[in-house]
Amino acid sequence: MAIRKLRPVTPASRYLSYPEFDEITKSEPEKSLLAPLKKSGGRNKAGRITSRHRGGGHKRFYRIIDFKRNKDNIPATVAAIEYDPNRSARIALLHYVDGEKRYILAPKGLKVGEQLLSGDKVEVKPGNTMPLKNIPLGTDIHNIEMKAGKGGQIVRSAGAYAVLAAKEGDYATLKLPSGEIRKVRIECRATIGGVGNADHENIVLGKAGRSRWLGVRPQTRGMAMNPVDHPMGGGEGKSKSGGGRKHPKSPWGQLAKGLKTRNKKKASSKLIVRGRKSK
């Protein structure tokens, strides 16, 4: 994927960049795989804000993605590579030989016309899915299950890939994109290759309005608020200390820099060999 930059004819276009979309082969989505997507504006069922800085944005339909890849030993042909407004990765439309159609995350290098397969023992090539126990060590993988049969939950964003580092007993050891080294049950499935659209991280929005199109609202600094609205608010001028401002805090009073918030008794902690911030 190439990134296009504009001539700086306006202040907004000076740094703005956007993808060329040259890998997209189909402009209209498959209607049978669409679902309505209602916006919440960051509110829960009581109408209270539970996720700040959300609201507005362009209307979208949800694309139903097959994260389970449980249609075993039935060949599928890649019919199209499509844009999905709900995620950073591109999606691929598969036509199975029995007539069913499904969307999957488009791996890096996937082309229209290729044949894909999922099952216990299939060819090791980008887009094929199989259990971790049958994947060779050192292979790049994505869309990894945390619980067998539940469907892929991690390593799904654009350009992401994990490396299968080891297998021992009932567990496989993975090196995740964050740097975390983690154990996963060996019967869990993963898809070969990395997720496509790796240049997504290099895109510059360029102007505030483009964030609004994505449904992201402006973010106000705590120091610019009043004391009633934020622990770091108030004071004369740009006060950096006093009145609870000595240590940066979240809007709810929790220390914002360096405080560990993960539950120490969490059961999955024993599966983390090395944390993402460990040296």
Curated annotation (Swiss-Prot):
Assigned keywords, A-Z: Ribonucleoprotein, Ribosomal protein, RNA-binding, rRNA-binding
Keyword Transferase: no
Region described as Disordered: 223-279
One annotated GO biological process: cytoplasmic translation
GO molecular function, one term: transferase activity
Gene Ontology CC entries for this record: large ribosomal subunit
UniProt cross-references to InterPro entries, sorted A to Z: NA-bd_OB-fold (IPR012340), Rib_uL2_dom2 (IPR014722), Ribosomal_uL2 (IPR002171), Ribosomal_uL2_bac/org-type (IPR005880), Ribosomal_uL2_C (IPR022669), Ribosomal_uL2_dom3 (IPR014726), Ribosomal_uL2_RNA-bd_dom (IPR022666), Translation_prot_SH3-like_sf (IPR008991)
Source taxon at top rank: Bacteria
Biased composition (Gly residues): 232-242
Compositionally biased region (Basic residues): 259-279
Family per similarity comment: Belongs to the universal ribosomal protein uL2 family.
Subunit note: Part of the 50S ribosomal subunit. Forms a bridge to the 30S subunit in the 70S ribosome.
Biological function: One of the primary rRNA binding proteins. Required for association of the 30S and 50S subunits to form the 70S ribosome, for tRNA binding and peptide bond formation. It has been suggested to have peptidyltransferase activity; this is somewhat controversial. Makes several contacts with the 16S rRNA in the 70S ribosome.
Protein's UniProt name: Large ribosomal subunit protein uL2
Native organism: Prosthecochloris aestuarii (strain DSM 271 / SK 413)
Gene name of the record: rplB
